[in-house]
């Protein structure tokens, strides 16, 4: 069953993608359980996505096995409205993931190191002149 799409303006899409990272296709299979993802379909329809339940996931679509990502809208399987669904990698044009605390810490440390390195380069450049 296909979910009816909600149309989001470009501004709304941009807002919903704040703090999400565009994942290169060759890394999609490394997105782990529990990660929240958002994506664009091949038809360029924005989807708010869900939490990764299983990835990669082998889905049978029209008697053909396809690599997919299995998503859920919450972790409470008994909650009213809880749903799971699979999206074939072939049907995704762009996939975004929300980084966890570890990745945000790494990013922050890299940014600090890069800033310090840039300061060192500027200091050296001023001494050479």
Swiss-Prot record:
It is an enzyme of class 3 (hydrolase). Keywords: Host-virus interaction, Hydrolase, Inhibition of host innate immune response by virus, Inhibition of host interferon signaling pathway by virus, Interferon antiviral system evasion, Viral immunoevasion, Virion. One of its GO terms (biological process) is symbiont-mediated suppression of host innate immune response. Its main location: virion. It is found in: Virion. The keyword Hydrolase applies. GO terms for cellular component: virion component. Its EC number is 3.1.4.-. GO terms for molecular function: hydrolase activity. Plays a role in the inhibition of type I interferon signaling pathway. Mechanistically, specifically interacts with 2',3'-cGAMP and cleaves it via its phosphodiesterase activity. In turn, prevents 2',3'-cGAMP interaction with host ER-resident STING1 leading to inhibition of downstream signaling pathway and type I interferon production. Belongs to the asfivirus C129R family. This is Uncharacterized protein C129R. It comes from African swine fever virus (isolate Tick/South Africa/Pretoriuskop Pr4/1996) (ASFV).
